[in-house]
Amino acid sequence: MADGGRVAQARALLQQCLHARLQVRPADGDAAAQWVEIRRGLVIYVCFFKGADTDLLPKMVNTLLNVKLSETETGKHVSILDLPGDVLIIPQATLGGRVKGRSMQYHSNSGKEEGSELYSQFVSLCEKAVANNTKSVEAGVAVAHGTYGNRQVLKLDTNGPYTHLIEF
């Protein structure tokens, strides 16, 4: 359940990192695998549920990019925009799973087309928010993202037990 007893429309898992690398396309014949990567920053895993709509996206982006979870060298907690740090966005439908017996079920997740559209717009809004942030622009902050609906390989170096689950 999200705040106030209402049913969640989305779930995001935030993971601080020193470096992350995500394979967005596997090797195929002569073509090498394609990867996106970020330096120190934030990995955002995101899942949308049935009933989610585009009205939710600005609130999600504002919350996720402005929550003070990143730690400076002096130990002060700041947002990823204030750090500034890179952002890697990964679609993660398994965040919507529920245990039934000894199996996982994903009946609450949005449909593939709806989820793909919400994910695409979420990525765009994150890119715009970073591009409109002076500190991020000056630091050359990167926003990278995975491909909705594909299995992806992730390599991640973390800098502490900084993993947070947020429902919207």
Swiss-Prot record:
It is an enzyme of class 3 (hydrolase). One of its GO terms (biological process) is aminoacyl-tRNA metabolism involved in translational fidelity. A motif (Gly-transPro motif, allows the protein to recognize chirality of D-amino acids) lies at residues 160-161. One of its GO terms (molecular function) is tRNA binding. It catalyses: a D-aminoacyl-tRNA + H2O = a tRNA + a D-alpha-amino acid + H(+); glycyl-tRNA(Ala) + H2O = tRNA(Ala) + glycine + H(+); D-tyrosyl-tRNA(Tyr) + H2O = D-tyrosine + tRNA(Tyr); L-alanyl-tRNA(Thr) + H2O = tRNA(Thr) + L-alanine + H(+). This is D-aminoacyl-tRNA deacylase 2. GO terms for cellular component: cytoplasm. Homodimer. It is found in: Cytoplasm. InterPro entries: Daa-tRNA_deacyls_DTD, DTD-like_sf. Disulfide bonds: none annotated.
